């Protein structure tokens, strides 16, 4: 019983708590039914003919959803409004429960709560960054955009940089679009002007004078460049100009020589190449004048060897035989040995030579020595029949079968031994070193030809077979007076250019008479060690039909005569006078010599070389680097040289290529016309 009594008391306490709460949350029966009852409105006479009004319909009075529809006149807005409207009613008409007020956004009164429901601008439907204002409308809203924005909600940025009415936003260089605006900027190397639209170039060279170091600073729009002379490249790390090694880039066809600021291409002229007009590739040196180089194996050339005997024959004949030699002889040379004969023991000898253009005979036997020079001058370039015959008591010399000399003698020229006459005959030279044994010294070298020889009355026995198969022992058929350079060798002279009577110290006056057969080659050069301090050369002109006469000091051109027609059947004269103070180049064909602007400095280089030992070369340069001078091809053609008033005789040279003809030059080949 006590237990039940306790439980009853607890139940009564719970009911006591529930009853007040229920009274708070639930309306009375009368009040609750009022929501569903439409009160009588004012103006009921015209109510159905007037458009709904939110204030009148739903604030001053309570409205149902149909009446709310009359206010908004569209379903979407009505559907949006009415649930929120009921929330406001629950907050402000029914009671003041705190949670209900929170759900109505804590509006101060019912009117504010209901008014806010239909405001299309609350919450703001516009883009917060782009809108300026929002205007509420019935079932609509209008967003007013800030400058630089567009769209119904101001959600799109206006790209002023692409406005066709204001190209590039009015910026002179870069237009940068930003949300709702834009701004102008400048490229690197430019600065913005106060108008914020135009850019001005910055002169980096003036702002930073040392920006290029030792190079030259050049301002350009928006930037600067560090310039170097041709042949140099700017090195940013050292801020200096470094030489460009063009040769590492295979610029030249044959030899490339790099030097500070440039490079030069060279071709091996000694192999018949010259530098082409592009100054990089090589091409063959063409013949500009054809010479008659035809030879005859029956003509023995006496100057095949610069030093030494051309042909050696030995005869062993009966002791009754006497010496005799008969031959046709042609030369323009004035001095030299035709033949030398001797006994086996060298005790007796006979020399037949030419001195001053006349026949000279020297001999020695066991009884006497004799020398005789006489007769007509026969170095006239035509064939002359010469005979030397030993008689009983004399030696007879005939030219064209006419006796010109008769030399008395005692005994035989050569003494027989054991019933035989042994005789050795040498053509165009002396055996061993017997010059000292001669009665009168003579230059043995002789540029001449013999044919139809009959020695010791044995005809051409032995000699014909020797020379027949050797081209270098054959003579040209047609020659003229002059010196011939075949384009394959040089001649060297030792010349003293110092002039003690001249205040200039040294002088070189050169006169050349030339008839070139190729348009490129070195005519005269001075060589000192591995350098060429002076060279007088021919170079084919750019036209291809004429030649340039060029003077070089080492690798520099100091004088040039352009476009001279030298490849003709007539010889041309050329003069070059030079000393330490000046240079003069002259030819009657042209007067307009081009001299280097740096002539005096280049002459100083030559002057320094002339104070040392220099060797003079004709027809080319020796075997030194063919980069020592721009032209290294051998000269080809006829040429006679006079230096300081002395006519150079190639027979007097220190050395001479065997194919150089000292006193004869092939004639110009005649072109036969077909009729």
Swiss-Prot record:
Positions of the Laminin G-like domain: 299-475, 484-665
Chain positions listed as propeptide in the UniProt record: 25-41
4-carboxyglutamate modified-residue sites: 47-48, 55, 57, 60-61, 66-67, 70, 73, 77
Ranges of residues in domain EGF-like: 117-155, 157-200, 201-242, 243-283
Signal peptide: 1-24
Tissue distribution of the protein: Plasma.
InterPro entries xrefs: Coagulation_fac-like_Gla_dom, ConA-like_dom_sf, EGF-like_Ca-bd_dom, EGF-like_dom, EGF-type_Asp/Asn_hydroxyl_site, EGF_Ca-bd_CS, GAS-SHBG-PROS, GLA-like_dom_SF
Region Thrombin-sensitive, residue ranges: 88-116
Keywords from the UniProt entry: Blood coagulation, Calcium, Cleavage on pair of basic residues, Disulfide bond, EGF-like domain, Fibrinolysis, Gamma-carboxyglutamic acid, Glycoprotein, Hemostasis, Hydroxylation, Repeat, Secreted, Signal, Zymogen
SUPFAM superfamilies for the chain: Concanavalin A-like lectins/glucanases, GLA-domain, Growth factor receptor domain
GO cellular component: extracellular space
GO biological process: blood coagulation; fibrinolysis; positive regulation of phosphatidylinositol 3-kinase/protein kinase B signal transduction
Localization in the cell: Secreted
Chain positions with (3R)-3-hydroxyaspartate modification: 136
The record's account of how the chain is modified after translation: The iron and 2-oxoglutarate dependent 3-hydroxylation of aspartate and asparagine is (R) stereospecific within EGF domains.
Covalent S-S links between cysteines: 58-63, 121-134, 126-143, 145-154, 161-175, 171-184, 186-199, 205-217, 212-226, 228-241, 247-256, 252-265, 267-282, 449-475, 638-665
Glycosylation sites noted in the Swiss-Prot or TrEMBL record: 499, 509
Domain Gla: 42-87
Stored Gene3D superfamilies: 2.60.120.200, Coagulation Factor IX, Laminin
Protein name per its UniProtKB record: Vitamin K-dependent protein S
Organism annotation: Mus musculus
Gene: Pros1
